[in-house]
């Protein structure tokens, strides 16, 4: 799908201020993303999610992340994620490739 190394750079620039990916990583403003792929929304243990996030009821995967990362507030109205989104599909694909790799270790 995307390029893991390019995705890592995007994560560092746009996501790492609020999220960690490593197993056992701490929650920041946003939840630790380890184990993200295949998990339902609002399920990272120990993180305080909005009801909107908990009630969305989708499972994170390539397709759901592709849509969410384009415009988080449109995909989950009421989310507390303040990130505006990534408009370029190729950049989202790179980020998702990195997340698939980094959050599964």
Curated annotation (Swiss-Prot):
Residue intervals passing through the bilayer: none
GO molecular function term, any single one: electron transfer activity
Compartments in which it is found: Mitochondrion intermembrane space
Main location group: mitochondrion
Post-translational modification: Binds 1 heme c group covalently per subunit.
Gene Ontology cellular component annotations, sorted alphabetically: mitochondrial intermembrane space
InterPro entries noted in UniProt: Cyt_c-like_dom, Cyt_c-like_dom_sf, Cyt_c_1A/1B
Residues annotated to bind heme c: 15, 18-19, 81
Gene3D superfamilies listed in its UniProt record: Cytochrome c-like domain (1.10.760.10)
UniProt keyword Aminoacyl-tRNA synthetase present: no
Post-translational modification N-acetylglycine, affected residues: 2
Keywords, comma-separated and alphabetical: Acetylation, Electron transport, Heme, Iron, Metal-binding, Mitochondrion, Respiratory chain, Transport
Entry keyword annotation includes Amino-acid biosynthesis: no
PANTHER family xrefs: CYTOCHROME C
Role noted for this protein: Electron carrier protein. The oxidized form of the cytochrome c heme group can accept an electron from the heme group of the cytochrome c1 subunit of cytochrome reductase. Cytochrome c then transfers this electron to the cytochrome oxidase complex, the final protein carrier in the mitochondrial electron-transport chain.
Family that this chain belongs to: Belongs to the cytochrome c family.
Protein name in UniProt: Cytochrome c
Species annotation: Chelydra serpentina (Snapping turtle)
High-level lineage: Eukaryota, Metazoa, Chordata, Craniata, Vertebrata
């Amino acid at each position: 799908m995307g390029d893991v190394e390019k995705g890592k750079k995007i994560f560092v620039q746009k996501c790492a201020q609020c999220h960690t990916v490593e197993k056992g990583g701490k929650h920041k403003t946003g939840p630790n993303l380890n184990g993200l792929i295949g998990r339902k929304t609002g399920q990272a243990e120990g993180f305080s999610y909005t009801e909107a996030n908990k009630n969305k009821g989708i499972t994170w995967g390539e397709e759901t992340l592709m849509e969410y990362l384009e415009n988080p507030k449109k995909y989950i109205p009421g989310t507390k994620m303040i990130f505006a989104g990534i408009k370029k599909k190729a950049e989202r694909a790179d980020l998702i490739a990195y997340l698939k790799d980094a959050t599964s270790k």
